């Protein structure tokens, strides 16, 4: 910090010496009253910089730290509250998940598993001749109904498209 401050001071002193040299050169070149007036205005606009001591810099830093510290503490407190609420939500969700898992384990077979019977070749079901005939009869009836539905859909399309202007 001290090194940077020393560099800044050296740079400022260098700038001041350059401005002085330039103003001296301009004064020596000024041959007309108009030029003298212009140079006078330029020199009046030159800003002067003062050195700032290290104790002043430290005092300013301490003032800023004292001003900012309560705000930072408030922000940290708010973040801690939010984190604790998120932790409690996480615990609640974990316990709810465990409860749901235990409920699922109590019912090993879902409704679908009970209804769906795998249709493997290994699962051969013995049926009587009557049941087989009834099944074939139901399949024929099903095919007839499919055909009837197709015919009705076709008639419906014909009636809709037949009414369209050509």
UniProtKB/Swiss-Prot annotation:
GO terms (BP aspect): attachment of spindle microtubules to kinetochore; cell division; mitotic sister chromatid biorientation; protein transport along microtubule to mitotic spindle pole body
Listed GO CC annotations: cytoplasm; DASH complex; spindle microtubule
Subcellular location: Nucleus; Cytoplasm, Cytoskeleton, Spindle; Chromosome, Centromere, Kinetochore
Keyword Nucleus listed: yes
Keyword Nucleus: yes
Keyword vocabulary terms for this entry: Cell cycle, Cell division, Centromere, Chromosome, Chromosome partition, Coiled coil, Cytoplasm, Cytoskeleton, Kinetochore, Microtubule, Mitosis, Nucleus
Functional summary from the UniProt entry: Component of the DASH complex that connects microtubules with kinetochores and couples microtubule depolymerisation to chromosome movement; it is involved in retrieving kinetochores to the spindle poles before their re-orientation on the spindle in early mitosis and allows microtubule depolymerization to pull chromosomes apart and resist detachment during anaphase.
The family this protein is said to belong to: Belongs to the DASH complex SPC19 family.
Self-association and partners: Component of the DASH complex consisting of ASK1, DAD1, DAD2, DAD3, DAD4, DAM1, DUO1, HSK3, SPC19 and SPC34, with a stoichiometry of one copy of each subunit per complex. Multiple DASH complexes oligomerize to form a ring that encircles spindle microtubules and organizes the rod-like NDC80 complexes of the outer kinetochore. DASH complex oligomerization strengthens microtubule attachments. On cytoplasmic microtubules, DASH complexes appear to form patches instead of rings.
Protein name as it appears in the record: DASH complex subunit SPC19
Organism listed in the record: Yarrowia lipolytica (strain CLIB 122 / E 150)
Name of the gene: SPC19
């Amino acid at each position: 910090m001290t090194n940077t401050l020393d560099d800044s001071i050296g740079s400022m002193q260098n700038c001041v010496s350059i401005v002085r040299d330039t103003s001296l050169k301009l004064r020596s070149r000024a041959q007309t009253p108009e030029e003298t007036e212009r140079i006078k205005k330029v020199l009046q606009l030159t800003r002067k910089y003062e050195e700032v001591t290290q104790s002043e810099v430290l005092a300013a830093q301490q003032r800023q730290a004292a001003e900012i510290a309560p705000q930072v503490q408030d922000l940290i407190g708010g973040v801690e509250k939010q984190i604790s609420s998120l932790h409690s939500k996480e615990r609640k969700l974990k316990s709810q998940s465990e409860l749901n898992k235990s409920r699922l384990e109590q019912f090993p077979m879902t409704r679908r598993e009970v209804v769906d019977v795998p249709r493997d070749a290994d699962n051969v079901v013995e049926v009587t001749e009557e049941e087989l005939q009834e099944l074939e009869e139901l399949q024929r009836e099903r095919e007839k109904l499919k055909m009837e539905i197709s015919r009705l859909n076709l008639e419906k399309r014909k009636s809709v498209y037949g009414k369209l202007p050509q």
